Design a protein with these regions (language model features):
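Glycine-rich helix-loop-beta junction characteristic of Rossmann-like nucleotide cofactor-binding loops
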Residues: 65-70
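Membrane-interacting alpha-helical segments
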Residues: 4-11, 15, 19-22, 26, ...
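Generic preference for hydrophobic
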Residues: 63, 77, 99-100, 206-208
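Catalytic core of membrane glycerolipid acyltransferases/transacylases, capturing the structured
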Residues: 20-47, 55-57, 71-128
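Thr-Gly-centered strand-to-loop micro-motif
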Residues: 64, 101-102, 123-125, 153, ...
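Short gly/ser/thr-rich secondary-structure transition/capping motifs
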Residues: 56-64, 132-133, 187-190
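Non-catalytic C-terminal accessory region of glycerolipid acyltransferases
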Residues: 3, 133-251
Length: 251
């Protein structure tokens, strides 16, 4: 079975890398145009990856709480980070977004070139308080421009089922912006694990909260709520994955 998964993952990677090179090079010709135009162009690559991994590796997904999304008001997404999958899939689930990411990622050939077209909030983690201030100021600016902002408060990809430390940056932005906040949990790491070449077939469960009203909440209070919600729904996502694994073995 793992041999089949390996060759299916090879096929996925060939398609992903080939189209990444194509989109990142052609995307440079969209630089003179608006951010909306650049985003729309690169957005097709992200959506392709979601479809391609389903066709080649059998990685599907279903969303719980899609009805909670208000497409008319830009929101802040504080999401679980387990895999590369969510960076693609969120572009199929939510409206136009700006990502908060490590500045070093923009130096990665092809991938970084494409990301630079999307006006990300690229921070230097070593800058400490300066990086937090940048996250808040640029995040507020993007939200005011009508773009959603995606923050992974754990700061890095975590193993499936393991909750990392919830950093304060996303909560500080939520407190300052007073924008609706959506919490997102999923179990993508069960099927597309961190640092693993092989993708396992299965269905990723994505949980989206109702928008939180943070107008009267401090950053600390928001952070506590984020940690509590993610912990609870991480357990739900893990239980769902375990149930599917048991059914798979029985069959």
């Amino acid at each position: 079975m793992k041999i089949i998964w390996f060759f299916r993952s090879v096929l996925f990677s060939i398609g992903q890398i080939t189209t990444l090179i194509l989109f990142s090079v052609l995307g440079q010709f969209t630089r003179p145009f608006s951010f909306a135009t650049r985003y729309q162009f690169m957005h097709y690559w992200a959506r392709f990856c979601v479809v391609w991994v389903r066709w080649t590796c059998g990685v599907k997904y279903r969303v719980h709480g899609a009805e909670n999304i208000n497409n008319n008001t830009a929101g802040l997404i504080l999401a679980r980070h387990e895999s590369a999958w969510e960076t693609f899939a969120f572009q199929a689930i939510f409206p136009r977004q700006a990502y908060v990411l490590k500045r070093e990622l923009l130096k990665v050939p092809f991938f970084g070139w494409g990301m630079a077209l999307l006006n990300p909030i690229a921070i230097d983690r070593a800058a400490g308080r300066k990086a937090l201030n940048q996250l808040v100021s640029e995040g507020v600016e993007r939200l005011e421009q009508g773009d959603w902002v995606v923050v992974f408060p754990e700061g890095t990809r975590m193993p499936a089922g393991e909750l990392g430390k919830i950093n304060i940056g996303g909560a500080m932005l939520a407190s300052k912006a007073k924008a609706p906040v959506y919490l997102v949990a999923h179990n993508a790491g069960e099927f597309w694990p961190k640092n693993s070449f092989i993708k396992r077939p299965g269905c990723i469960d994505v949980y989206i909260s109702k928008p939180l009203d943070t107008a009267e909440m401090s950053a600390s209070e928001i952070n506590q709520q984020v940690e509590s919600w993610l912990s609870q729904h991480l357990s739900s996502a893990q239980a769902s994955a375990d149930a599917k694994e048991e059914i798979h073995h029985k069959s």
